[in-house]
């Protein structure tokens, strides 16, 4: 394959992996450990 094609596929896979990890952290089981800054701050 062309090196540009391999580079494009590699970049796309890395981008999808980072997006999947962010969605998993935001909405999956690890989200129970996330704090809400609005609840933590009292005016």
Curated annotation (Swiss-Prot):
Q: Answer whether the UniProt record assigns the keyword Ribosomal protein to this protein.
A: no
Q: Which Pfam family would be a valid example here?
A: PsbN
Q: Which compartments does it reside in? A: Cellular thylakoid membrane
What parts of the sequence cross the membrane?
A: 4-24
Family matches, as InterPro entries: PSII_PsbN
Provide one Gene Ontology biological process annotation.
photosynthesis
**GO CC aspect terms:** plasma membrane-derived thylakoid membrane
Establish whether keyword Thylakoid is in the entry. yes
* Major localisation: membrane
Q: Which UniProt keywords apply?
A: Membrane, Thylakoid, Transmembrane, Transmembrane helix
Question: What's its membrane topology?
Answer: Single-pass membrane protein
Gene knockout outcome:
In a double psbH-psbN deletion has a no more deleterious effect than the single psbH deletion, which suggests it has no role in photosystem II.
Indicate the family of this protein. Belongs to the PsbN family.
Report the protein's function: May play a role in photosystem I and II biogenesis.
The record's annotation in NCBIfam families points to:
PRK13183.1
Q: What is this protein called?
A: Protein PsbN
Source organism (scientific name): Synechocystis sp. (strain ATCC 27184 / PCC 6803 / Kazusa)
Taxonomic lineage of this organism? Bacteria, Bacillati, Cyanobacteriota, Cyanophyceae, Synechococcales
